[in-house]
């Protein structure tokens, strides 16, 4: 009887695990507090186009983020992009500096208290194509917060600091994003985010987009946004896919 009960419990556990849907950090700029499940590998990739002015544009084709779940509270990450930049008819293409990092869950959501996670990353200036190498290694840190407002509505926000690798100056980062689920597959988000540097004017932006679950482990997305500040890009668009699989 005990053996039969144990087998039934194992089946139920496997079914519940299989029903857990993929949680991604794209397409918005707000990093979620979710951790990739243990022993799972998650790939998030996409296309990104940004127009800054009449003479400047940037295309990432593709962007790539790889995440691996170490345990329920920790994931490891590596990311890079293949970029094509055009400035005054001069075009450069190549691989952006590789970024290594981790995300650690610090606190689960409790009543009015949000779930909390920490994201730490470092962009290695020398691991890039010749035209995209930077003078400095560029670390970044963020505190990630998330509130469940209802069974369909969530609020996420980040606060952090980052370095761009071009100068030694630090830039403050903030993001605020709301996401809404129409049903089990279709969702949308709207977001404000920005960058604050004492040596430059503030850069504030707005974006919005949609996500669609093909399966529990496969999601597609699309988004677009505009710059709000004078130094911000005119507009940007993105589309991508995310896929998760177990390595066991």
Residue ranges and their predicted role:
Residues 1-23:
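Bacterial Sec-dependent N-terminal signal peptides
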Residues 19-248:
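Transmembrane beta-barrel domains of Gram-negative outer membranes and organellar outer membranes
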